[in-house]
Amino acid sequence: MNLITIDFETYYDQKYSLTKISTEEYVRHDRYETIGFAYKINDERCVWVTGTNEHIQKVLDTLPWDDSLVLAHNTMFDGAILSWRYGVKPKGWLDTMSMGRALHGVDQSVSLASMAVRYAVGEKGTEVMNAVGVGREFFSPDALAKYGAYCRNDVELTYNIFQHMMLSGFPKGELKLIDLTLSMFIHPVLKLDTEALKAHLADTVAQKKAHLVSALQAVGKQDLAVKHILGDEETQAEVRKTLMSNVQFAAMLKGLDVEAPIKISPTTGKPTLALAKNDEAFKELLEHEDPRVQALCAARIGTKSTLEETRTQRFMDISKRGAFPVPLRYYAAHTGRWGGTDSVNLQNLPSRGANAGKLKKAILAPEGYVFIDADSSSIEARTLAWESGQDDLVKAFANGEDVYKIMAAAIYGTTVDKVTDGGRFVGKTTILGAGYGMGAA
């Protein structure tokens, strides 16, 4: 089995870049252009390739993909280019960025530059900073040669970092999980129901307006509710002006049984309302379980969309560009759990309330397949108990016993039938936390 380490250099500018749009949109965009790529087969000399798209395709077609694993530092990006732009499908995918999160934690930088320093394998160049807004044909021969050297260096860094990681004992089983995670994105097979999404978006917009009117009426702002219904720009501006008052907005939240969040002012050192659009507590209100609160907050910051609108519109945009790549981030949390990425979080689609299942049902299985939507009870605790050989816990699960109450009873020195809901929560936290190495303190 060969190892092909690869890195693509592509056109980008101030508005069209991975910092502005998702990987999916960037790679599928009509402005996409390959400047060049570098590849290294096993430990052979690294090669830089540039030229027309036809030339790039011709060179790629000569490489032994059928008998190779592909390695990159951000394989979601480079793999998508290989698959979507050039029809490449290797034996599997490897990714040093994913491996870095698992080895060094999600709170550490896993950029190629940081990893190169960590493993003392060299230094990442900065030539890419000179390529902003420059298409391939506008590079001078000297600049293009320097860009090629920069790209080859990235490949060498990635290859050497990978070798160090494997020598440190990175579990081979985890490599398969990384491959499966990346393959769901790089080789998409799901479709999106555009018509269902359109209908849901229209319903969501109507719901938002109704929720905001309901919220304004609930807090005694009947005049604002009427103006919002009228809907012209001048009246909308007046509604937002009122909502921008911290004192009035806090009072409105209180009218909906929600306490306005508080933060410590970095200027005065005293408590103040945390109602700025960048305050984390305020962001949480944008996802509040009460849609009236969501609508109030969205109106306050002048946004045109609630979270559900944004999600639905994003799905619609993807559906216009092709199959639906499933974006999951391997080792997204310190526990090792997967997480959402690329502006989509499939683990957090609504399952309750007015929008329950709407987006899920718009995701279509390939012909000949069906989706099974399941919420397996205590799946993590059951699996960990089985893998660790804790037979008493496995048996308790098999017998349908409430293991969280059993743990709580042991903690509080009482009987299972006397455990309160709060006590059960402590028992649940203990069992789940212990599975991730939580200590006694």
Regions found by a protein language model. Give the residues of each.
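Structured DNA-binding interfaces in DNA transaction proteins
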Residues: V416-A441
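Active-site-proximal helix-loop-helix substrate-binding element of RNase H-like nuclease domains
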Residues: Y32-Q57, L63-M166, I178, M407-Y412
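Short catalytic helix/loop segments, enriched in acidic residues and glycine
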Residues: L18-K40
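Short active-site loop/helix that positions an aromatic residue
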Residues: M76-G87, R101-L103, Q248-D257, S377-D391
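Function-dense linear segments that define catalytic or interfacial modules
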Residues: P327-D417
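Cytochrome P450 catalytic domain signature, combining two hallmark sequence patches
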Residues: K89-K91, K209, D257-S265, S388-N399
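Conserved "right-hand" nucleotidyltransferase catalytic core of DNA-directed polymerases
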Residues: M1-E9, Q14-K15, R31, A38, ...
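Short active-site oxyanion
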Residues: W65-V70, A237-V239, G368-I372
